[in-house]
Amino acid sequence: MSQENVEVIRRAFEAWNAGDMDTFRELCDPGVIWRGPEGWPEPGPYAGREAVMRQVEQLRATWDSDSFELISDFFDVGERVAVRFIWQTAGHGPESNLELTGVYIVRKGRCVAIEFFWDHAEALEALGLSE
């Protein structure tokens, strides 16, 4: 099952980078929970697909373009999948290259939880692993 979970998250990244928010939305469970990294400017968590998609729309509207560049392989522990990436943004908002690690819980082909970490080691600890 874990390789299928990795594929769900891979498809979500591909959809985001292609601007295909319909596919991204469908890969999120109706009850998905999104938690930003510590110190993120917008309060959270966001509970439910509609709240998550409103946050996504708000984030994406901040810049003319944004994309995720993977800087690690996907790895999985049971129903959880993690990947390290750089979120590159450009345009009318401040340009940035934010390095994050995302930890995702996937059930029945949909993402039910998303949590982001600035510190990769902290993300691994959340998975019960270490660097």
Task: Identify the function of each model-found stretch.
Residues M1-E131:
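C-terminal and inter-domain tail/linker signature
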